[in-house]
A protein has these predicted regions:
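Histidine/acidic-residue-rich catalytic or RNA/ligand-binding cores of hydrolases
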Residues: 326-329, 356-358, 388, 406
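A beta-strand-loop signature enriched in Asp, Gly, Thr, and Trp
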Residues: 338, 343-388
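N-terminal localization/anchoring segments of enzymes in phospholipid and broader phosphate metabolism
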Residues: 1-302, 306, 310, 350, ...
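Short, solvent-exposed amphipathic alpha-helical segments in soluble enzyme
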Residues: 331-335, 361, 430
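A short glycine-/small-residue-rich loop at the edge of a beta-strand within enzyme catalytic domains
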Residues: 295, 299, 319, 323, ...
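Helical hairpin unit composed of two closely spaced alpha helices linked by a short loop
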Residues: 311-312, 321-343, 347-348, 352
Length: 465
């Protein structure tokens, strides 16, 4: 009786989510064959949060239309016709408005990024807004923390959001020291018993910094020593951007929405959206697109699918982890079969063994359709970028995996500009020159049967990795 009392409501809950039939059946089977363990798994990893409204439409309206758009001056936008549907997709669903007049620096190693971040924090006059997944209490973390504390003691507004799970191993005293110095610090969706439920699976993976509303950072680098020094014998390769211009408005909005999420304070004022420097005048268009498990649609994933299916010549992608959702893998295979040059570059060895094992069966499917897979041998490549047809590119925090597309809070900058696309393309090709091409499925098939069987079993857990 106890079994039935638990199972029937659980199965009804799964059915009422109205997901894809395959996913619904998978969860029903888990609940049926592992009743008690299955329920725990479902609570942690299976709940559908897209129906939750953790931020009201009214608050979103105030944080967007009545703040950013009120101060943003956008005239004579020259929108490329071939990318207009993609831009409309992001604008209609995500309120990710395009901004022109952007100046961008690209960092491909941690030294450059941290130096620039510290330099710009040091120049801050009004505010520093930092949103990061990992903020470790190592030597580098203390360096950044000290810079933030110095600014707070000078009277500069400093707001910090760190992810509670990403910083699980960091001592509370590290952040308390910043609070005592006057920094407004919040952990994102803290995981505490008895609230230890699905929150553990939905994390803020964004890496955003905005300084005085004039300078912004976005990309794949967290605040930790390994992003500079590497791990063990492996060098660390990553991509991060520094932006000035109209796109900083969008980065500011992304941060302030997260701030409302953690602090329930609507921050909206002209001083957070200062006029763009008159020296920056170009048609480098950018949309800062965010995605989250509470949004109605998986916006960044839809953007990747759209790019893959609209490409005429090529799509080059870099990701540290490859556990693609069905729509993304299908789009990659479809584009490759249509003759588009689809290339995927990822590390030869991952920093997460389970992810590496699970990814191999997906790589086999991609290669069978003609996708060129490159395994990076110059260290651990943590970069998340995409470039297509010499006119479109994106850099951000999003991996090509279930977790980024479905579960995490992510942020990417999408650029519609030939010069920017060429710069990202050159970075990709340089990484490709330090990689080995795997264009034959036999590379994976030659491995022992039991090893391939194990990898296929691990693949079943891809949404959880």
């Amino acid at each position: 009786m106890l079994y039935m009392a638990i199972m029937i409501p659980a199965i009804i809950t799964v059915l009422m989510d109205n997901r894809q039939p395959a996913k619904t059946m998978a969860w029903i089977l888990v609940l049926a064959f592992m009743p008690f363990v299955g329920i725990i798994f479902y609570i942690f990893f299976g709940q559908n949060t897209r129906k939750e409204r953790l931020i009201s439409d009214r608050s979103m309206d105030q944080l967007t239309k009545r703040s950013m758009l009120e101060f943003a001056e956008q005239e004579n936008l020259h929108i490329p016709a071939n990318n207009k549907p993609l831009m409309n997709l992001f604008t209609n669903q995500n309120w990710a408005f395009p901004f022109k007049d952007n100046q961008v620096d690209i960092f491909t190693d941690g030294y450059e990024f941290i130096f620039s971040l510290l330099y710009n924090i040091g120049k801050a006059k009004h505010h520093v807004h930092l949103d990061t997944y990992i903020f470790e209490d190592d030597a580098l973390g203390y360096l950044v923390a000290d810079a933030l504390i110095d600014k707070a003691e000078q009277g500069v507004e400093v707001r910090l959001i760190y992810d509670d799970v990403g910083c699980w191993k960091v001592k509370d005293s590290f952040f308390e020291r910043m609070r005592e110095a006057g920094i407004d610090v919040h952990s994102f969706m803290p995981v505490r018993f008895p609230a230890f439920t699905s929150k553990v699976n939905y994390r803020n993976h964004r890496k955003i910094c905005v300084i005085d509303g004039r300078v912004g950072f976005i990309g794949g680098m967290n605040i930790a020593k390994r992003y500079v020094k590497g791990t063990g014998k492996q060098k660390w390769r990553d991509t991060h951007l520094r932006m000035e211009g109209g796109g900083v408005y969008a980065l500011q909005r992304a941060f302030l929405i997260d701030w409302y999420f953690v602090d329930r304070t609507l921050v909206s004022n002209r001083k957070y959206y200062p006029p763009v420097d008159s020296k920056i005048r170009n048609n480098c268009l950018v949309q800062v697109v965010t995605s989250s498990p509470i949004a109605p649609w998986p916006d960044i994933m839809q953007g990747y699918v759209r790019i893959l299916l609209q490409a005429q010549k090529y799509v080059y992608m870099e990701t540290p982890y490859f556990l693609p959702t069905e729509p993304v893998l299908f789009a990659m295979r479809t584009a490759a079969l249509a003759g588009v040059d689809i290339r995927l570059l990822m590390p030869r060895h991952s920093d997460a063994r389970m992810v590496e094992w699970a990814s191999r069966s997906y790589l086999m499917e991609a290669i069978e359709a003609g996708v060129k897979v490159y395994l990076y041998t110059g260290g651990f490549n943590h970069s998340k970028l995409l470039v297509s047809d010499d006119n479109l590119c994106t850099v951000g925090s999003t991996n090509v995996d279930f977790r980024s597309f479905e579960n995490n809070f992510e942020a990417n900058a999408f650029f519609y500009d030939e010069e920017m696309a060429q710069r990202i393309k050159r970075i990709y090709l340089k990484d490709e020159s330090s990689s080995i091409l795997v264009d034959d499925v036999a590379y994976f098939v030659r491995r022992p049967f039991l090893k391939r069987l194990f990898e296929s079993i691990v693949r079943l857990h891809s949404p959880l990795l």
